[in-house]
Amino acid sequence: MAMLSQPNDGHDHPEKKDPDTTPKQVAGVISSQDPPHPAKDVAEERARTDWDLKEMHEFLEGDEAKSEQILRLYQSIERDPILQTRPEQFDYTQKQERELVANRINQMTKFLETEPYGKFRRRLQLMTVIDPSLGIRMLVNIGLFLNCVRGNGTQKQFDFWSNKKEAGIVKQLYGCFGMTELGHGSNVAGCETTATFDEKTDEFIIDTPHIGATKWWIGGAAHSATHTVCYARLIVKDVDYGVKTFIVPLRDSRHSLLPGIAIGDIGAKMGRQGVDNGWIQFTEVRVPRFFMLQRWCKVDRQGNVTLPPLEQLSYISLLEGRVGMATDSYRIGARYTTIALRYAVGRRQFSKKAGEPETKLIDYTLHQRRLLPYLALTYAAAVGTDRLERQHEELLANLDIALAKKDKLLLKNTITGTKSMFVDSGSLKSTLTWLAADLINETRQACGGHGYSSYNGFGKTYDDWVVQCTWEGDNNVLAMSAGKTIIKTVQQVLNGKELKDSTLEFLNAAPELSKAKKAVIRIRDHVDDVDRVLKAIAGLISKFSKDLIPISYQSWDSIGAQRVILSKLRCHYYLLETFNERLNDKIKAKSPARPHLENIIKLYYVTNILGPFIDEFLRFGVISPQVAKYITYEYPQKLCANIRPYVIGLTDSFQQPDNFINSLIGKYDGNIYTNYLESVKDVNDPSNYKAPYSEALEAMLNRSALENRERSERGKAAADILSK
């Protein structure tokens, strides 16, 4: 160490040394040797899991076979170099995203050719969660297009377009769904594209008479589709028979537009930039008469039109999309509650006392109240949407059998089932897609600033998701329709009709429930009784509907908001009923999973049904006022405290792998900060520290003095000269 020079003043001075700059260990000072350990926190909480994850996953998915198939498909997807996710994909431009989707479609069609269709549908369902653009671009063909042909066409027509023309494996033909128009969306019956029969040539002339009839939002139309199933008004001998469906070719074998077809891209959207949504205009486009789908409505060579009484079944093709979106709500919910709860366990903020470790986010009661009700909802949605899928598959199978065998009894029961399915799918699709949108947004906010990073998935998924609330049935329109059916059903039951072969059979109790004077839930113990809670929901639906019947005679529109509430209540009854039945059927009393599922089901109905609709329950006297505070405040907090220690195990039970979750802060290992920083560095090379637009920044920072840029024309020297 160098010595300081001594002053030469004739006196002795003690030797002076340089100050000691060696770091000292001082309490409370941050040490580089002690970084945060979120992975340790997550691992410790994972060790609390005291149930079999396999049993829990089978409970969520419905059975062992489906659970095993889901897990193997996850594995297949994350191993596939084209289908797997990577952080850099969050930075893709629209052009890059569409190219990625096109490559993924190509890859997916190889599975479509070789594996059973049921397995492929499950694969596509999973891919739709991580790449919604891929999902919709494939589903417009194998879902909407082919389901419309199947539901509206004859068996020979379906065989021709699906098998001979190979639309079923997306080969030769790529179909799109030409329903919505610039001027009409939800009101399909109001579509104005025309299909006029020319008896001389045995052709239909498809035409867009004005701008409002331009087909709009047509997925796949801009670049991909070779054909469309066009919803157009059937006009024969100057008579308008309403909207029917027609196959219309759009492009030739070289993918060039056919004469009379005008198509364009509708441009940038809020989300799903990988989908080539387009507009279509037809100018006197001629198609053969047999290009009209004629399972229900028929037009013969002489222009005679036959309209069968079962034509309402033609809209059954729309059900698969609604069922699929309800199921997507479950998987989206599982993905984002997993991310948010892993982060909430690994992330610490603020100390309760100086010198103590910071508190985990999940240990704050507000954080529990924000996230755990969504976790419970996701469990309920898993079980309920599995039932809805199976119900839909059975309905389609019975319809095909009934029509093929001309079995009138089975057909009658199928029609009843179809009516129920329209209510069930409409109420579940609308309610769950709304709730999933709320879930994504709330879980994002619960992750603070890091939730705003694209690499953690929330932003893109939210932008991609919310279209679910307005397509294939606008949620408010669907909910009002379901609510209207519920009111009419209650009215029929009050008039003496008994419901059979319907999922609305619980409304057979409406005469008794609607007149009940005593509240169903009167004391705290009643809130723990699931059967009593189901009775309370049925009672509210019955009383609410009965109250609305006189108003409906005057105007259905004036009770639109109430119809939406009834639809939501019907959805929740469906989910709770299904959850309760499966819990009792599949989980044994001594199973370690059972107490956790009992807490989950209670938190679900307390925070998603009884609490949000407490005003209605109180207004109609279904719940006593003295238990309202317990329901809305005290009991939810108690249930959250019971569930809190097991949040990692409860989200692990979804069994979603890291590649599927696709979030840097939501990985299984819980190593939030390392995963985040290293991936961000990989995607954004730190050596590229100069921006492409650095020249503009440097010009701004290094600009010359204002006086020089004004050529010294405004300075004092110039003023002295010019003022004389």
Curated annotation (Swiss-Prot):
UniProt cross-references to Pfam families, sorted A to Z: ACOX, ACOX_C_alpha1, Acyl-CoA_dh_M, Acyl-CoA_ox_N
Pathway: Lipid metabolism; peroxisomal fatty acid beta-oxidation
Location of this chain's protein in the cell: Peroxisome
SUPFAM superfamilies tied to this protein: Acyl-CoA dehydrogenase C-terminal domain-like, Acyl-CoA dehydrogenase NM domain-like
Reaction equations catalysed: a 2,3-saturated acyl-CoA + O2 = a (2E)-enoyl-CoA + H2O2
Residues forming coiled coils: none
Cofactors (names): FAD
Domain of life: Eukaryota
Gene3D superfamilies: Acyl-CoA dehydrogenase/oxidase, N-terminal domain, Butyryl-CoA Dehydrogenase, subunit A, domain 2, Butyryl-CoA Dehydrogenase, subunit A, domain 3
Biased composition (Basic and acidic residues): 9-21, 37-48
Molecular function in Gene Ontology: acyl-CoA oxidase activity; FAD binding; fatty acid binding
InterPro entries reported for this sequence: ACOX_C_alpha1 (IPR055060), Acyl-CoA_ox_N (IPR029320), Acyl-CoA_Oxase/DH_mid-dom (IPR006091), Acyl-CoA_Oxase/DH_mid-dom_sf (IPR046373), Acyl-CoA_oxidase (IPR012258), Acyl-CoA_oxidase_C (IPR002655), AcylCo_DH-like_C (IPR036250), AcylCoA_DH/ox_N_sf (IPR037069)
Biological-process GO terms, alphabetical: fatty acid beta-oxidation using acyl-CoA oxidase; lipid homeostasis
Record-level GO cellular component terms: peroxisome
Region (Disordered): 1-48
EC number(s) per entry: 1.3.3.6
Keywords: FAD, Fatty acid metabolism, Flavoprotein, Lipid metabolism, Oxidoreductase, Peroxisome
Protein family per UniProt: Belongs to the acyl-CoA oxidase family.
This protein's name: Acyl-coenzyme A oxidase 2
Annotated source species: Candida tropicalis
